[in-house]
């Protein structure tokens, strides 16, 4: 039995660690984070320089111990994240620099499910962030198309006021259909509700005579009326000159506890039909916006709070904030929101040149998957805890490198790559984990897009080229390059090659047409002139080699010796 590697201070016993000249298997079983971090940092150096250490790790159980560290997850502390990162680098060094037998052991130990989880989480996070970034850019760009009106105005509004209100509502109508199926809590936390972080957004309309109130009555102008359902019924009271909800004042508990309250300021002077209208949107706190109407001496303050989609990037004029369900049961009208989101998608076409569009990401996704709208909405729930589980760029690069080396010529290991599971403990969101079978080549093909770094594109293309290699153990046959087709050649040169790269083969025109959107990103063009020049250079080299073998002494003689010998012979004859 191996002795447990623990540090006992009162017995003057130190834990066993690994250094640059000594490897001890017990150091990987240490429960101290600091000593384990120190041992793994030295093990990274040993696995990159010593072939003997790489072989020993696959025999004494050290490789399985590293895999268990990777499956356990990163954790939330700096020490656990560093230990996870060092363990991944050790496994990558063993798989890249090891022999064929060592690479097979690494694949059998379970490195492919870990890489599958990293790649899919990275793509999922990138799609979510890009979709929110595109909405944020759209909210900053001026829009000329007015939002769809769901109900007619109860009184004539001047064009200046209507344009100003439309500009405010357009900033708030950029909600996509990804968020209409549920409430999204705020990712900024409850600390933003303090008094020091209060923001005030106001829109003042000071033209006299712009608003006319018929019959000396006021009305309740709800913000973004098309998002309110039929449950918010209102009633007119001409004697008091106010409009309010029926169920807001009947139950005192609703008025005291519900965040949706109406405060009425009475005045003895009546309101005039033509007066100065000041519309102020005051956001006192991030969770309690207020809408204030002041008509002459009489004023009425209405605090409205309705459900709205919460963005990861806050818009400058966001007067709609998220709230919890109150006793009023304010419900969203799904049809209006979907039609409004459809119009917003049509207007959200101008993005920054350096940011990839959402359509480009969705085109690169695997064919059989549909974008999970609920998953994208849940990605920003508790984002501060998920940021530690977000795959880094070096993690993606390490994963692609080890896949490129382990999928090279090992065709008997293809089932590990084409039918792999994920690791639920490594997932950022529990909604992404499941019993689905993943094809690693379908995930890797998405990293051949142009906006990825050149190193990521290089290794992704190398993996896709390995997928199209010929199987020399079965007579040099190739597989159809369509990722959804599993046909192999019955004999060599049965399938037709791609005309551009002359590497991939397809069993039919349908497979080539179906696989071309993905294959076009990693298809390298081979020019005929280049191939002819290579052939000519090979012929010239073969001719020179034959001449050198025929007369080896002639190549040793300098260039000017023939003229010298001929001149001496002529002198002797004279």
UniProtKB/Swiss-Prot annotation:
GO biological process: establishment or maintenance of cell polarity; positive regulation of flocculation; ubiquitin-dependent protein catabolic process
Chief localisation class: nucleus
Ranges of Polar residues composition bias in the record: 243-253, 283-301, 562-574
InterPro entries xref list: ARM-like, MYND-type_zinc_finger, Znf_MYND
GO cellular component, one term: mitotic spindle pole body
Annotated residues for binding of Zn(2+): 498, 501, 519, 523
Stretches for region Disordered: 207-253, 283-307, 534-574
Listed Gene3D superfamilies: 6.10.140.2220, Leucine-rich Repeat Variant
Location(s), subcellular: Nucleus; Cytoplasm; Cytoplasm, Cytoskeleton, Microtubule organizing center, Spindle pole body
Keywords linked to the UniProt accession: Cytoplasm, Cytoskeleton, Metal-binding, Nucleus, Zinc, Zinc-finger
ZnF MYND-type: positions: 482-523
Low complexity compositional bias, start-end: 542-556
GO molecular function: zinc ion binding
The family this protein is said to belong to: Belongs to the MUB1/samB family.
Name of the protein described by the UniProt record: MYND-type zinc finger protein C31F10.10c
Species: Schizosaccharomyces pombe (strain 972 / ATCC 24843)
